[in-house]
Amino acid sequence: MRKINLIVVHCSATRSDRRFSVEDLIACHNARFGFTGYHYYITRDGQMYQTRHENLPGAHARHYNQHSIGVCYEGGLTPDGDYADTRTREQKAALHALLKSLKVDYPDALILGHRDLPGVHKDCPCFDAKTEYSQL
């Protein structure tokens, strides 16, 4: 079993007025990596999908994949393409429940956003995940 010390939250960087289904995510990642890079994906309606087994490294945070779990929510861009926290109430609830469950399995893992990793110059996940989930 892999030693997990990070749970990294991402957004799909897709516009909030356009659907990006789990099938779209899988097709996009398969074309790029040959597999899905995130371990979990949460769509706007709050549905959570496991898209990669936890004991396999992902492809979501360069230099950190070996010891992390990647969780992505659908969205992160306004209809105009600006970065924003576009999580729905359902996504927030599903994300909180998933992260709480992952902390049971990986109690020493730090939850943070992709943007919080050293050397990452992105807005992803477009909110302060480190602060929001610091009490889990």
Regions found by a protein language model. Give the residues of each.
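A short, polar/proline- and glycine-enriched secondary-structure boundary/capping micro-motif
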Residues: 20, 59-66
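Short, conserved "active-site rim" segments that organize catalytic pockets and cofactor/ligand binding
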Residues: 1-56
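Short amphipathic alpha-helices and their capping/turn segments at secondary-structure boundaries
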Residues: 55-62, 100
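Basic/polar, cationic surfaces and motifs that engage anionic cell-wall
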Residues: 1-8, 12, 16, 44-47, ...
